[in-house]
């Protein structure tokens, strides 16, 4: 029924783009992906670990997917970043919330196009609160990449090294840390 309905809509409206709200992941299948874009992959937008897990798992297969955040906490916000992003805030009682929103949305805008690039996991998949989870998105066509590394709530390690993909030893790379504002240049290894 649903596939036929979408087929009818697409045949009747040549330029139509259908946004697939994935129904908690139940509508992420090849037939649905043929007919629609997965712009809302799950309603688990309040759980950073669920967001991270979805990004890790889907990015192997889908260049365009996302959800967003319901929080301006940087950890939570960044956990929902992807090739598509929606920010849902309750600003009714506190219009000053937009100051933080503008800052985080500027950060997202700077890296958003990279999320449709090549995906490289930098850790094993895990939902454990004691682990790190990290990945790299790379856009060789644009000469840019982004690394997201999340130290989960019960992890006591302040430092973790990751072997990045696609670096060349004779090229100097610019690295920027959104948390500290630190910018440095380093050669690949």
Predicted regions located by residue number:
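Active-site groove signature of glycoside hydrolases
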Residues: 1
